[in-house]
């Protein structure tokens, strides 16, 4: 558990030389060859929505259908033809609609899903468009915006559309839904950019744990985990790390034990669990949590999204540089899991801001689906939100849960 023993295996991701293109309809949905032939728009990005730019138009990556293109009426937009037929707003023949050429993934989503299912983690290298990355860096006060200061987390979603756009990135959400085998997924806490500041050699470093909702190794009370350790056919959590800055070994990239996928167990106590490393004096007495040959670090360029099964053991990295390193850390859970933090207040603030008007209908709809938990029953559908009076009653009776993450 000392710095001298820090020798993880480094998985280094290179910036892609090319990305697939997405053709975004006015609704925000994507033009797809849904059955290998028929063109239509759809609300998710899988292999059917991938295109390759070529001279004079676009060719479908899977079925090879070719579209000709010309400049659209909107800035940076295109209008499309399949043969002599103009492509309408819903993807079929109709009055020509303006499509926007979007920033797609490096690899086919089906390839990424196969890797995710095989190993419990996958990286979408530079999946976010450069302008979205720039907006996230501005919110977090990192990289080129380090001297400008950061926007407080509770205000970020209502300040810049980049955070919402990163949160509703379609390929990572499709992968989460496929990996969990359900459509209704939610955020476990509100989105926000955080910065890992340079290490001072003294402060606590978060130790080994599994993420929400499992929390294996995280709670103060030994064994008081949200989900009991052990094998379970269902997947209750995926962690989504968005690299706002480049993630490197020296600037505090997350330390994993990627081989722990499928272990269904709490991290070893000797490695330095999170429920111990937060305690005052622990670092001075024991050094840093384990980082030896059984561990891994994923180095990735800014704009990369790393998805991993929440049961994979991991711990915080240590920033040994003199610069802040930015990230968006998100827990993705099934809709029936109670969130880790309330997401309704930030969503309400977002609704009351001018940011929704800067997003398309698909982006607004997806963000609402991710942030609003619901009761659906015989009486109808209700949004779930904290009740102040009942919360005070619980706290007054000493029944509030206490945990350190």
Which ranges hold each PLM region?
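Short hydrophobic-aromatic micro-motifs
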Residues: 123, 242, 306-308
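Lectin-like carbohydrate-binding module/patch detector with strong preference for beta-trefoil
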Residues: 1-104
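Non-heme Fe(II)/2-oxoglutarate
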Residues: 102, 305-307, 311-405
């Amino acid at each position: 558990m000392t710095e001298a023993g820090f020798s993880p295996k480094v998985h280094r991701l290179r910036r892609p030389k090319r990305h697939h293109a997405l053709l975004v309809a006015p609704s925000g949905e994507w033009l797809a060859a849904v059955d290998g032939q028929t063109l239509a728009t759809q609300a998710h990005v899988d292999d059917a929505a991938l295109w390759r730019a070529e001279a004079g138009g676009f060719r479908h990556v899977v079925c090879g259908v070719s579209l000709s293109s010309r400049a659209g009426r909107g800035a940076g937009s295109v209008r499309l033809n399949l043969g002599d037929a103009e492509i309408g707003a819903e993807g079929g023949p109709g009055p020509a609609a303006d499509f926007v050429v979007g920033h797609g993934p490096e690899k086919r989503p089906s390839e990424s899903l196969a890797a995710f299912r095989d190993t419990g983690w996958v990286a979408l290298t530079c999946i976010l468009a450069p302008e979205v990355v720039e907006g996230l860096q501005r919110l977090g006060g990192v990289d080129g915006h380090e001297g400008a200061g950061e926007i407080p987390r509770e205000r970020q979603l209502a300040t810049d559309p980049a955070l919402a756009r990163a949160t509703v990135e379609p390929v990572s959400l499709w992968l989460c839904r496929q990996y969990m085998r359900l459509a209704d997924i939610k955020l476990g806490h509100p989105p926000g950019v955080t910065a890992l500041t340079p290490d001072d050699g003294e402060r606590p470093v978060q130790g080994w744990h599994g993420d929400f909702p499992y929390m294996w190794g995280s709670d103060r009370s030994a064994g008081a985990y949200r989900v009991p350790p052990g094998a379970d056919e269902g997947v209750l959590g995926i962690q989504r790390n968005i690299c706002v800055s480049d993630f490197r070994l020296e600037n505090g990239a997350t330390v994993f034990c990627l081989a722990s996928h499928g272990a269904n167990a709490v991290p070893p106590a000797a490695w330095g669990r999170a429920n111990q490393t937060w305690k005052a004096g622990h670092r001075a007495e024991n050094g840093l949590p384990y980082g030896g040959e059984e561990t891994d670090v994923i180095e990735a360029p800014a704009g990369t999204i790393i998805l991993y099964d929440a049961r994979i053991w991991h711990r915080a990295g240590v920033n040994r540089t003199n610069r802040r390193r930015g990230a968006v850390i998100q827990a993705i859970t099934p809709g029936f899991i109670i969130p880790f933090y309330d997401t309704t207040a930030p969503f309400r603030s977002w609704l009351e801001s001018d940011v929704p008007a800067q997003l398309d209908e698909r982006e607004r709809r997806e963000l609402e689906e991710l942030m609003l938990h619901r009761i659906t029953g015989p009486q109808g559908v209700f949004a779930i939100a904290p009740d102040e009076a009942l919360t005070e009653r619980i706290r007054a009776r000493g029944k509030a849960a206490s945990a350190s993450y």
